[in-house]
Design a protein with these regions (language model features):
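Short, contiguous alpha-helical
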Residues: 37-86, 128-170
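Alpha-helical bundle segments that constitute or directly flank the non-heme di-iron/ferroxidase center
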Residues: 6-34, 54-65, 151-154
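Helix-driven interaction modules
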Residues: 105, 124-128
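Short amphipathic alpha-helical interaction segments
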Residues: 99, 103-110, 114, 136-137, ...
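Amphipathic, soluble alpha-helical interaction motifs
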Residues: 20, 24-27, 31, 62, ...
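Amphipathic, heptad-repeat alpha-helices with coiled-coil/zipper character that mediate oligomerization
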Residues: 76-77, 116-118
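A non-catalytic, amphipathic alpha-helix used as a structural packing/dimerization or gating element
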Residues: 13-20, 106-117
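Short, helix-capping/interhelical loops that line the mouth of catalytic, cofactor-
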Residues: 1-12, 62-110, 167-170
């Protein structure tokens, strides 16, 4: 799919990539979801399927947090309080830790809920708010949402497919 350029394309990209991701997730045996075999978000590290979902939930929740704080006129620490943009590997580790007690089913429910909340957020905004004004630095809100939802959903789907192929799973 092309990079979204407006509200309608953003919703379609999220829905499309999320659907493809959930199809891949639905065929994974639960007993394999905690094994750290996928290439991690930091060089020379590995993560589990559960870690990958935690990463997606973590970034989705950050998008919602950023929007909430901005909506209240509060300062937002991008990407997250205590982390700089050059420390995204550490932030990924934080997400894994934040959700380490959640099982595969719970993580999937959290991802469903987070994605639903983001789609509701998008629906509540006019296209001008999403794509016609800078929201963070030079980035629009729509671009920030896309970078933390539809693009990572596609990346996660591709990682899972590669992992399934290596492990001879369908």
């Amino acid at each position: 799919m092309a990079i979204p350029k407006d509200k309608e394309e953003l919703v379609k990209a999220i829905e499309y990539n999320y659907k493809k991701l959930t199809i891949e997730l639905s065929t994974i045996p639960t007993d394999l979801t905690t094994i750290k075999e996928l290439e991690g978000h930091t060089k020379n590290t590995f993560m589990s399927i559960n870690d990958l979902i935690a990463y997606l939930v973590g970034w989705g929740q950050l998008v919602l947090k950023w929007n909430d704080k901005k909506g209240k006129g509060l300062d937002v620490d991008f990407p997250e309080t205590g982390y700089k943009w050059n420390e995204l590997g550490l932030l990924a580790q934080k997400f894994y830790k934040d959700y380490e007690k959640d099982d595969f089913k719970t993580l999937n429910k959290k991802l469903d809920n987070t994605t639903f909340q983001i789609l509701k957020l998008i629906e509540s905004k006019a296209n001008i708010e999403l794509y016609e004004m800078a929201w963070y630095d030079k980035w629009t809100l729509g671009k920030m949402i896309q970078l933390n939802t539809s693009s990572p959903f596609k990346n996660a789907k591709d990682r899972i497919r590669k992992w399934k192929k290596i492990n001879q799973l369908k």
